[in-house]
Amino acid sequence: VKRSERNRARILASDGVMELTVHVRNANRPRQPVRDVRLDYSKRWQHQHWGALVASYRSSPYFDFYAGRFEPFYRREWEFLADYNLGLLEVLCSLAGVPMPELSRTYVEAAPGDLDLRPKRKEGPALIAEPYFQVFSERMPFVPNLSFADLLFAEGPASVSVLGRCRQG
């Protein structure tokens, strides 16, 4: 999980990109299934994240409209990273007006000798972002590949149509 996208989000702060990291226990365990990753609250990351979101986005056009749906993720103590991520995904899908992806209820272990031929790391971004007005646009150029919250706080109900204008990289 260490250095994984499963527990990170990028937002735009007044001095540039800020990476928010959800702290987890035993981050260095290799090949730990995400369903078994437990959250670590010893570092007060929830307080830091919520403070960063408020400081960065309170002047965004839609922050006040959506903030109440995000705040519970920074008040409640979730046990597992997977539950936290799924809960947040449900809220994001709901706010964006898109259906929640259907997820499997069971995990099928790969058979011994099965080859995973998918590339391990893709080169460059899969999509080229459609620029939109960001909270600090008057001070810095457009910053792509941020959290969906950045787009949602800036564009509100138009967020999905902005995503639809992205093109293949």
Protein language model annotation of sequence segments:
Residues 1-169:
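Residues lining hydrophobic/aromatic ligand-binding pockets adjacent to catalytic sites
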